[in-house]
Amino acid sequence: MSFPSIHRHGYPFICLAFLCSCIGFALSSSLGVIFAMITALCAYFFRDPIRVIPLNDALVASPADGVVTSIVEVESPLNDGKTVTRISIFLSLFDVHVNRVPVSGVVKSVEHRPGSFSSAGSGGAVNENERVRAVIESSVGGHCIVVEQIAGVLARRIVCDLESGKAAKLGSRMGIIRFGSRMNIYIPAGMPVSVAEGHTVVGGETIIASLDADMATVHKDLTFDKV
């Protein structure tokens, strides 16, 4: 049996918890057990499993593990006057926190936007919470796909590894939200969406939309890779 790897941003938490467990065992067995459990939970929270990624640049994959909470048409967050479809995904404490690039293309911008730390499940979190917003110009069709990592009550540390001007590959790791929260992805209105509210999605694996209007062509003879 193999165990999933750990994301590098999890090691400080795991090492600190492990050190506390060693000190705890030196003081009392019960205290040591408590910190050992915390160490195991940290390792679980920061797990980074291999994913089976579709090798098709015409697809849009889920950027995170979680549950689709809403699919609505809204004004573009880029304030360009366009209408887009926003797909919101809620990440619980028990979901994988590592985020994945939703579409292949070139990163046009990465912006940190300060804000509040409301519950990720609340309506105010959509527009008011602190976030990191990345814009990717898709290699197929030249669409601007916007993806947002949103902070929450517990998730107050967002890490985004994307860099403006660099290429981004569908399914590759793009960062992490510590201890669960929410992600939004904005795609052009009218683009075929493959999920519905309430669906459980897997980051980098679950196909949520297509850049090609002909879904039959897009899904024909798909190949995959493990990343």
UniProtKB/Swiss-Prot annotation:
Paste the cofactor note: Binds 1 pyruvoyl group covalently per subunit.
Any Gene Ontology CC annotation: plasma membrane
Cofactor dependence is on: pyruvate
Q: InterPro entries recorded for this chain?
A: PS_Dcarbxylase, PSD-A
What post-translational modification does the entry describe?
A: Is synthesized initially as an inactive proenzyme. Formation of the active enzyme involves a self-maturation process in which the active site pyruvoyl group is generated from an internal serine residue via an autocatalytic post-translational modification. Two non-identical subunits are generated from the proenzyme in this reaction, and the pyruvate is formed at the N-terminus of the alpha chain, which is derived from the carboxyl end of the proenzyme.
Q: Which GO terms describe its biological process?
A: phosphatidylethanolamine biosynthetic process
Record's subcellular location: Cell membrane
Q: Give GO terms: molecular function aspect only.
A: phosphatidylserine decarboxylase activity
Q: Which reaction does it catalyse?
A: a 1,2-diacyl-sn-glycero-3-phospho-L-serine + H(+) = a 1,2-diacyl-sn-glycero-3-phosphoethanolamine + CO2
E.C. designation(s): 4.1.1.65
> What residues make up the catalytic site?
181 (schiff-base intermediate with substrate)
Q: What is its main location?
A: membrane
User: What family is this protein classified in?
Assistant: Belongs to the phosphatidylserine decarboxylase family. PSD-A subfamily.
Q: Which PANTHER family match?
A: ARCHAETIDYLSERINE DECARBOXYLASE PROENZYME-RELATED
Protein name, per record: Phosphatidylserine decarboxylase proenzyme
The organism encoding this protein is Anaplasma marginale (strain St. Maries)
